[in-house]
């Protein structure tokens, strides 16, 4: 197999990407996987940069709009697909390989076997998108197996997803180390998201209410959980045009709200027809500096599956 590292060579077949990653591991190079659905932005590129910090790693970025994680009526068909532009960005970033399979390649027999998240997948996102995490965990498990990865990188914007992936790595004894990477935001605080392209100028301005509410809630962390929720909730309630699915304060492991210590404030809401999620770390009982100065709170610990 002829292969030139750093050129973002595109692989569409499971067999071919597997041949590459097995050969690299045999040669002593670990495999670092960055799973994405494409429509790449600076948040995704921060995952790439984190993966490139693994000494000697072969960095593989997967681009796959996974139909299994979209319910009927969601935005599967509308989800932006920009493969050529994505590959150009990844080549400029020095990524080694891109795995961009078709749905038929990934699910030749349909979704016969799925992984379900258990109780932790029934709250927050799971309460509003009950089939979502089974689709996510199934495709992530497949990508881990296909690429033989040693490391995998996920953004903290999808905080519940990150914890559930850590959960299956632990529970299924996978030999993969999962790394959480902090949220990347626009200069005005909006969390980077591929779905931001759906927003009109007016909706984008309104979407800033989410990060504003989280920041305001976190700033009163020393006053306790009730003050955090009341403050954040009042900002969301005052904004016309935002339909909130949930605003919840939970432990960093998504357990019930602690009285003090590190917690996570999470929100999901529709702005127009676009559903957005965001979250922030909240140091209950202590001060809060803001999103740009240590304000993401404690990240989930990296999870080694060995």
UniProtKB/Swiss-Prot annotation:
Catalyzes the condensation of pantoate with beta-alanine in an ATP-dependent reaction via a pantoyl-adenylate intermediate. It catalyses: (R)-pantoate + beta-alanine + ATP = (R)-pantothenate + AMP + diphosphate + H(+). Belongs to the pantothenate synthetase family. It is found in: Cytoplasm. Its EC number is 6.3.2.1. (R)-pantoate binds at residues 69, 161. This is Pantothenate synthetase. Keywords: ATP-binding, Cytoplasm, Ligase, Nucleotide-binding, Pantothenate biosynthesis. It comes from the Bacteria. The reaction proceeds by a bi uni uni bi ping pong mechanism. Beta-alanine binds at residue 69. One of its GO terms (molecular function) is pantoate-beta-alanine ligase activity. The gene is panC. One of its GO terms (biological process) is pantothenate biosynthetic process. The keyword Ubl conjugation does not apply. It holds the Pfam family Pantoate_ligase. The active site is at residue 44. GO terms for cellular component: cytosol. Disulfide bonds: none annotated. ATP binds at residues 37-44, 155-158, 184, 192-195. Pathway: Cofactor biosynthesis; (R)-pantothenate biosynthesis; (R)-pantothenate from (R)-pantoate and beta-alanine: step 1/1. InterPro entries: Pantoate_ligase, Pantoate_ligase_C, Rossmann-like_a/b/a_fold. Homodimer.
